[in-house]
């Protein structure tokens, strides 16, 4: 029997095949426990394997442009767990995503901005939501541009993908042609997004923010 990649990571962590900390183990245990609970009618949520695999498959169509030679993306098991959990868990009533907020903490050079770039590109153009707004934010514009530039690299390294987006570097905006959504990089000037309703808000380097005002505006 083949197990989906999200669940396989959880099983491997709980079997000590993958070294992980207590919080990761708790998230994996929750995943397994909730899959069992989902079999009962009163439980509000279920795990949609197709939706989980869909975003992981999307990630693996992308190209890593940085370096001497371009390489196809191969998602690591922990990345599969993050992506699959966020997109796969759904409400039984309405098929809405279960998780509206996530906190992802990774060590330096472990692909945090890369992962955020995947989420922004996917939810910007391939999630069927029309006229959405996706914000890549940080305390400073240079930091916000790191995630934005990850998306730009994905687009520029793939001729098919480049047909689906239009990049406006002068104002740090990407038009999503399929959904008519926009992806935009913003700095800690919170007034610039006050009143907007983001479909996806990414707060990069959250620990560097002096308060949670940006997070609250994106909620």
Where are these predicted regions, by residue range?
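Phosphate/NTP-binding elements of NTP-utilizing enzymes
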Residues: 2-219
């Amino acid at each position: 029997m083949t197990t989906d990649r999200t669940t396989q990571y959880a099983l491997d962590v709980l079997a000590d095949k993958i070294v992980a900390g207590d919080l990761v183990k708790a998230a994996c245990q929750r995943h397994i426990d909730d899959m069992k609970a989902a079999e009962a009618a009163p439980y509000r949520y279920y795990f949609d394997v197709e939706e989980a695999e869909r975003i992981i498959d999307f990630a693996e169509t992308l190209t890593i442009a940085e370096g001497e030679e371009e390489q196809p993306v191969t998602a690591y098991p922990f990345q599969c767990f993050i992506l699959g959990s966020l997109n796969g868990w759904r409400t039984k009533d309405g098929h809405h995503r279960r998780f509206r907020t996530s906190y992802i903490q990774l060590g330096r050079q472990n692909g945090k901005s890369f992962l955020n770039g995947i989420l922004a590109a996917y939810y910007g153009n391939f999630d069927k939501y029309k006229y959405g707004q996706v914000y890549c934010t940080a305390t400073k514009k240079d930091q916000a541009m790191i995630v934005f530039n990850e998306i730009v690299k994905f687009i520029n390294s793939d001729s098919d993908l480049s047909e689906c987006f239009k990049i406006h570097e002068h104002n740090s905006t990407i038009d999503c042609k399929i959904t008519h959504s926009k992806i935009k990089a913003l700095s800690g000037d919170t007034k610039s997004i006050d009143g907007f309703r983001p479909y996806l808000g990414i707060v990069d380097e959250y620990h560097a923010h002096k308060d949670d005002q940006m997070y609250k505006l994106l909620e």
